[in-house]
A protein has these predicted regions:
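Acidic, surface-exposed loops and disordered segments
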Residues: 1-234
């Protein structure tokens, strides 16, 4: 079995390096991840900014046999049909306007190109989407919830928390993939985890060591030119 090098808690990554090297990984090694390291990461990330110090994030870490059970349940759930739950929020605006539509399309096509899956291969693309619900083979998974009564500012807090989690993971030699695709199955996941009805599932996250030999691991999505998102007023 292939193994990655575990950088460990003594990592000397700078913040700049962690930001530059963090990517959404969609192929993981089976190598297990230290649960104490994962828990410590979630604790450390709680220093993320939070308006009014509300700290609205609620985390569920799934590993070992419980993750095996979840993957099997979702394999059966998505095998023949794809009947999602009633969703709590739309991942993208409808309709998605430019330039956002083109950015999303290009990222998807770049990924499928690396996988060798053409636009006409609909079944292969559907199967690739199902891989989301196997966490791309990752040995650890995170689900993040937020109370129904929280507003947009608290959702921003949640995003800052998750970014901090991912940077800390990267600084400790781990990779991740935030997955809003799990928002399609909020009731299914909540029932599996025993989460209260008043909480919304925001996303899942695959966590583990990237498979360096997988073609999709070479994916680096483009970023817009600075002039598209920065205006300096002086």
């Amino acid at each position: 079995m292939k193994e990655a090098v575990n950088v460990g808690v003594t990592s000397t990554y700078s913040v700049t390096e962690a930001v530059a090297q963090r990517r959404s990984i969609r192929a993981f090694l089976a190598q297990s991840v230290d649960k104490d390291l994962l828990r410590d990461t979630l604790v450390q990330a709680a220093r993320a900014p939070s308006g009014g110090n509300l700290q609205p994030w609620k985390n569920h870490l799934v590993v070992d046999q419980r993750l095996v059970d979840l993957k099997q349940m979702m394999r059966e759930r998505t095998l023949d049909s794809f009947q999602e739950d009633t969703v709590d929020y739309d991942v993208y605006p409808k309709p998605l306007s430019e330039p956002y539509r083109t950015r999303r399309f290009r990222a998807g096509e770049d990924m499928y190109r690396l996988l060798g899956i053409g636009a006409e291969q609909k079944a292969a693309r559907r199967q690739r989407f199902r891989d989301n619900f196997q966490f791309f083979g990752a040995p650890a998974a995170l689900f993040c919830f937020i109370d129904h009564n929280m507003g947009r500012p608290q959702w921003v807090d949640l995003g800052m928390y998750l970014q901090t989690v991912m940077l800390l993971l990267k600084a400790n030699g781990l990779d991740s993939c935030p997955q809003e695709s799990w928002s399609l199955f909020p009731k299914t996941v909540s029932s599996f985890l025993g989460v209260a009805d008043e909480e919304i599932l925001f996303c899942g996250m695959a966590i583990g060591y990237a498979d360096p030999d997988a073609p999709v691991s070479a994916l680096v999505t483009e970023r817009a030119a600075p002039d598209e998102f920065i205006r300096v007023h002086a």
